[in-house]
Amino acid sequence: MIMKSQQNRIEVSDQTLVVLRAPQRIWSKLYQYQRVCVQWLWELDQQRVGGILGDEMGLGKTVQVIAFLASLSFSGRQLAQGSRGSKLGPTLIVCPTTVMHQWVREFHHWWPILRVSILHDSGSYSGTSASSLIRSTCANNGVLITRSDH
């Protein structure tokens, strides 16, 4: 249950206080409906359930997902060791081949701190085995982008 929503801070109340902090440089550029989406994604994460994000093309689904992942990354960096709370773990994004490189560009634009790799013949793992790339991405809590089409 969301208790309080400030400009770039979402506090969730359950048995313990868990806080998601969105980076100001991202949060300040989001439209209100995109902020609501980030809050919704946070609620799903806290409930340990999935969801489907869908709307018209061009309304910023990619940016909303990146804002959420950046917030998990940002919050995780600020968590004191041993405290409870969410942080970003390894992330898999499955999308059409035609937009994989667009995802990478958007990550580099919005939150370049994250390590982002493409697992595809045209991607960033040339010269490295796919299993090596997957292990490296998991070890570094990075983002792996792969295709959904065959």
Residue ranges of model-derived segments:
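ASCE P-loop NTPase motor core, strongest for the SF2 helicase catalytic module
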Residues: 2-150
